[in-house]
Regions:
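Surface-exposed patches in mature extracellular/periplasmic domains of secreted proteins
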Residues: 22-29, 83-99, 178-187
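Short, functionally critical alpha-helical segments immediately adjacent to catalytic or ligand/cofactor-binding
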Residues: 22-39, 46, 69-73, 97-103, ...
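N-terminal capping segments
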Residues: 157-189
Length: 189
């Protein structure tokens, strides 16, 4: 995750907490990293989101980074709910939510009804279908899920061990300092 994205962590945390998805800060940072690397005035690339009601609904229409983050967090929340994500490590459902963030609100119900969830193959199929329907050369990023997940530390096991995932989940707990997880894992923090 770039320094430019890290600068936005306090705002990401603020809006994630405000919209009830405080445990997904790392996922939101990974999305921002893929969308913009933290660059520009629309770092979440959320101008075309249904949550943008103040700026033009065109690429880079939002010119206020904080508003972009607020809209992006709401869009991610909507995708997490639509995909029925249960936790920050519910990777099958997170993949569905991420592709939905990139493709818009039609993908999640289509993938669930047609295939029972996300696959790379159905992401390609949906993109091709939508591009054809709209008369466009392409539609979205067919590889969006792997592109985002390369930045998501909870989505992989660093250095071949599972300990880091557990520690990061514990650290992400707001309000209790992760104490229940630290005790569960054998630390007397």
């Amino acid at each position: 995750i770039s320094a430019e994205v890290q600068v936005y962590e306090p705002l990401i945390r603020k809006y994630a907490k405000q919209y009830g998805i405080g445990e997904y800060v790392e996922l939101i940072k990974a999305v921002m990293m893929q969308e913009s690397g933290g660059q520009g005035n629309d770092p979440m690339q959320s101008s075309e989101s249904s949550f943008n009601t103040k700026y033009p609904k065109k690429a880079n229409g939002i010119t206020n980074p904080e508003y972009s983050i607020e809209c992006g967090v709401q869009e991610i929340k909507s995708c997490l709910a639509g995909a029925e994500v249960k936790s920050p490590v519910d990777m099958d459902q997170i993949k569905l939510a991420l592709q939905g963030y990139n493709y818009g609100n039609g993908y999640i119900p289509w993938a669930k009804e047609t295939y029972g969830g996300y696959t790379l193959a159905n992401a390609v199929e949906f993109s091709d279908k939508m591009a054809k329907e709209k008369g466009w050369e392409s539609y979205g990023d067919k590889q969006y899920v792997p592109h985002v997940l390369r930045y998501y530390s909870l989505g992989r096991i660093p250095n071949g061990t599972g300990n880091q995932v557990i520690v990061q989940v514990a650290l992400a707990q707001e309000g209790n300092g992760g104490d229940i997880y630290w005790r569960w894992y054998g630390f007397g923090r």
